[in-house]
């Protein structure tokens, strides 16, 4: 039986590739919109979808059918139907777009940081429904938090889908109100709202997703798929040394150890001699696969499964980084970073010990020193050695990981040089690494 979400078609793999993060507050319609995008682009199994639709009808929940595509897919994944299927994708005219970290995940914000460090662009879904919109961008709203995050993670390409237009009877006034409020927030974050497309959509009904809707005669901009089609794939840093943060490790009968992750920089080829750090285990690349197809070489942006000889599954874990033996990824003893405090109920001082999420790693850390506080607008220091920093502050700090972890300077390897600090179930700060003090690594 085919998976509910179809694998990439041969045409897709010929197209430039973009990783898209879908963000927004819970219940604003992210899953439904993703399901709708996959359906409209021919990436949903027709027979499977008919079953889902019938089931939704019987239960009187017709509006849930598109969201249930993702639920069905998650079930397939949990039953171990596919390994590579953590990523789903669809095609536009010019691009193949992979959706990273499907919405609705419990650790979505954390994964946004780890996952969005892999995103080239973001789709922000905001509901026009009264109450839902106000909650989403309010002080405690996830919508607001997600926008802060994608900004901190350096994602420049953004489209805003104003969803559930059917619920507000396609009211232009409500759309303009939502657009104006979100624009204010984007401006505050340093985006230029005039350069960002807002599209009034209904994920349930399909308005303005693939085709222009007659329900919104007052809107004459592009459809959502047309906007996505304008996104530019980022330059892929093939000339840098190899860095591949590990997302998952499997042991496959007859094949040995397979590490799964995304190549962030450099090029990986079959036959390469590689090292995984912090554990400092060395092995040889037997083969590389993406979406069930063998690759001779993997480049930045490729999500791959790498079959490695000489390394056991027990030796490596999510958060380790694969590199080549002639340029070993940096295991760090201490870092100096610029952070922005996104949320904290009181104040942060030296000795504060949150958890750092960096690329695919999660590690307890301690802020050992507050070096200076900066003016957020100019980046100039306004206070040396402040006693504390609070929400909204930008500061340069010294951080000590309490366990071995790979971290690089943001200027050398951006995806391994940006991180989030979490505590109390919330994202406290996001940052970029300015300096790294390397730890000694003995290759085994």
UniProtKB/Swiss-Prot annotation:
Matching Pfam families: GTP-eEF1A_C (PF22594), GTP_EFTU (PF00009), GTP_EFTU_D2 (PF03144), GTP_EFTU_D4 (PF14578)
Protein's name according to its UniProt entry: Elongation factor 1-alpha
Reaction(s) catalysed by this chain's protein: GTP + H2O = GDP + phosphate + H(+)
One GO molecular-function entry: translation elongation factor activity
Record region (G3): 101-104
One annotated Gene Ontology cellular component of this protein: cytoplasm
Top-level division of the source organism's lineage: Archaea
Alphabetized UniProt keyword annotations: Cytoplasm, Elongation factor, GTP-binding, Hydrolase, Magnesium, Metal-binding, Nucleotide-binding, Protein biosynthesis
Binding, Mg(2+): 31
Region (G2): 80-84
UniProt-listed Gene3D superfamilies: P-loop containing nucleotide triphosphate hydrolases (3.40.50.300), Translation factors (2.40.30.10)
EC number in record: 3.6.5.3
Organism encoding this protein: Pyrobaculum arsenaticum (strain DSM 13514 / JCM 11321 / PZ6)
Region G1, annotated ranges: 24-31
Homology family: Belongs to the TRAFAC class translation factor GTPase superfamily. Classic translation factor GTPase family. EF-Tu/EF-1A subfamily.
Region (G5): 202-204
